[in-house]
Amino acid sequence: TSLTDSQLEQLLKSSEGWFAAVYLNLCSFSKSGELPGKTSDIYQMFSASMLNPLPEDRKEFLSAMGLADEFTEEMAEFITKREDVHQILKMLTRQNAFVTCLNDGQTYRFHHMMKECAFRAFRTLDDSRQAFYYERYGAWYEKHGAYIHALSAYRRNQNFAAILRVVQKDAGILLASLKPEEVLEVLNRCPVSVLKEYPLAILVLMR
């Protein structure tokens, strides 16, 4: 069965030009007669061929960094506390393993299929490991003034003191985009003892 023009366009878009992604998409197409969507088993196929064979520590590295849309070597070192990040990224990009270095020569990005599979693998980590990485992401983004990203990471980790600290630092500038229900959720779930430590943050949230 040949692909239609619309299917070819879909394949090009979903594969982002990665040969391995094209191959996995076509394998799925040969079995079902349809190109895979987000609900298909192509992600299981991808994980089985690209993630599962890796050593656990390498798999965890990819799982953790899959949370970021883009990242630098410095960021990956901070998030994972690994000293061999340079070697890992060099190996992955050399093998064309769904990780690419952008034109600036410093920023890396996962293919969307790798990112989705990495996130699925991340959710299988112990709660303590997930909490560790969310805390590291929050700290990185907070340090670099990316307060919306920091807030998102801290919320996933339920670190309410860090949430209010970020709100107080931002003074409502970037976080003005928060929906009212999100603000109420933070206030309702935050322990009173923590709220008392950050009165200025409460004023910012109640604007």
Specify the residue positions occupied by each region the protein language model found.
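Extended alpha-helical scaffolding segments used for macromolecular assembly and cargo binding
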Residues: 128-207
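Amphipathic alpha-helical "lid/sensor" segments that cap RecA-like P-loop NTPase cores
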Residues: 2-46, 53-60, 66-73, 81-82
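Short acidic/histidine-centered micro-motifs embedded in hydrophobic/aromatic stretches
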Residues: 10, 14, 24-28, 64-65, ...
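C-terminal boundary/linker of central alpha/beta nucleotide-binding cores
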Residues: 44-121, 132
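Active-site catalytic pocket residues across diverse enzymes, especially alpha/beta-hydrolases
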Residues: 29, 80, 122-126
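Short helix-capping and inter-helix turn/linker motifs at the boundaries of alpha-helical repeat units
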Residues: 2-3, 37-41, 52-53, 109, ...
